[in-house]
Amino acid sequence: MINLKKKLEALYTQKEQIEQEIKSLEQQIEDELLKSQQEQKTTFSKDEKIDIFKSLFIARNDIYAKKWVSQDGNKQGFYPVTRTFRGEDFIPLTNKEIEAHLRGLVHLATYCIDSHNNSKFVAFEILDEDKFKLQIALNSLGIRAYYELNSYNSLIVWVFLEASLPSKIAYNFAQFILKKANVTAKVYPNKEFATKASLGNNIELPLHL
């Protein structure tokens, strides 16, 4: 009888070990399937691409600017889009307009400070000869930056923030970077606060084909 009880206890122990191994294997299989699905996600729908673009570059959705070029081509610039010429009845930015920008049909710019006086990025318009000095300063701070040439052939350096910050902090952070790099540059945002009457500077959106 004692031997039978010991044998039964041993079987129960083995059963528990086997069940634990089964659970462990099931979890490993589930993790591998999830990892495989994530790795297979190499293509995105049109709306997903636009959402990614917006998450990076669009500082505010309620106001945006569009490039205007005179008929003779001598004058051009970005101006806020409004319903009339009153100047304050701004038209919100839509996915349709962003798609048109990405297709090269229109040329848009975003304002760098949102309606809550927050910023999601800082950017610099620098001379080509200063890019190495700026990059050295960014490297020393552990900051990753992205470079592009805008439609005016100016070098733009984008630094994306992990989360939106008060524009005052973002502006002073940008000034700190320039001081550390010992360079001068046009800064986005170019002020600490924005109001409806004074929106702050806008920056040309990239990836315009």
How does the language model describe each region?
Residues 2-12, 19, 23, 29-155, ...:
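Signature for HUH/AEP ssDNA processing cores
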Residues 182-209:
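Catalytic "initiation/cleavage/transfer" segments centered on a nucleophilic residue
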